[in-house]
């Protein structure tokens, strides 16, 4: 990076098992750290150190919190995002890709996220977030900012900035597998409404619903329901 910041890469040359691997990697890393050490976690492939972090600690301490999470930009709409991930503090949705905090509280929080059988780290982050008063969301985006596709060209004043990954076939398939468990009921209800409102299309809509339900049963992740 252009600022010469020392970075510890976690999970390199390890087999990817799922999103919770990131949490496990952080917990392993901080196991040897002191409780009062402050750790910053950044997703490796889509995050930029946008500004010199020389004043990072002083900015963090002004938030008067032990753990600071980044805010989800909700590019797919607030309702859908909350349906998938839940919410954290002040009606904001936490993003699991950027966060920082003291080792002591991070251990408590991150270990709590691993208690869930759900394989989606971001949903677990939001569920566990509600349990602890020592967590805040970076609503002002002074330290962390997650850029959504519709604000991709926006200049950011945050120290760390995460950009959306490019859309690909593999990403689309992965999204279906992981997130259809939260949305399939809504989709089937919409198809049912469509059949009622447009009876002439009853047959094709029925087969679309049957196809989607079959794909869901066979392939979708169901760990969070």
Model-flagged regions — what are they?
Residues 1-38, 190-225:
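N-terminal anchoring/stem segment of glycosyltransferases
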Residues 2-9, 62-66, 130-137:
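Structural alpha-beta junctions
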Residues 7-16, 69-73, 120-122, 137-144:
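A generic structural motif
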Residues 14, 46-47, 54, 74-75, ...:
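Conserved beta-strand elements of beta-rich interaction domains across eukaryotes
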Residues 15-42, 48-52, 94, 118-129:
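A conserved donor-nucleotide-binding helix/loop in the catalytic core
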Residues 35-37, 64-66, 156-158:
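A general structural motif
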Residues 47-88:
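Conserved donor-nucleotide/metal-binding helix-loop-beta segment in metal-dependent transferases, i.e.
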Residues 92-186:
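Catalytic core and acceptor-binding pocket of nucleotide-sugar-dependent glycosyltransferases
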């Amino acid at each position: 990076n252009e600022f010469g910041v020392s970075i510890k890469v976690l999970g390199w040359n390890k087999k990817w098992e799922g999103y919770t691997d990131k949490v496990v990697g952080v917990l392993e890393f901080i196991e040897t750290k002191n409780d009062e050490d402050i750790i910053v976690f950044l997703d490796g492939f889509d995050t930029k150190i946008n500004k010199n972090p020389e004043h990072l600690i002083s900015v963090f301490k002004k938030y008067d919190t032990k753990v600071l999470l980044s805010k989800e930009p909700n590019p797919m709409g607030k309702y859908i995002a909350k349906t998938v991930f839940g919410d954290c503090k002040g009606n904001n949705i936490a993003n699991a890709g950027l966060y920082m905090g003291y080792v002591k509280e991070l251990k408590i929080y991150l270990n709590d996220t691993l208690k869930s059988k759900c394989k989606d780290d971001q949903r677990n982050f939001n569920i566990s977030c509600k349990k602890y008063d020592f967590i805040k969301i970076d609503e002002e985006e002074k330290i962390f900012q997650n850029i959504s596709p519709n604000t991709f060209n926006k200049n950011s004043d945050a120290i760390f900035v995460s950009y959306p990954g490019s859309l690909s076939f593999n990403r689309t398939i992965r999204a279906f597998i992981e997130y259809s468990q939260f949305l399939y009921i809504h989709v089937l209800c919409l198809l049912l409404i469509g059949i009622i409102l447009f009876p002439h299309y009853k047959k094709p809509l029925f087969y679309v619903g049957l196809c989607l339900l079959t794909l869901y049963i066979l392939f979708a992740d169901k760990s969070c329901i």
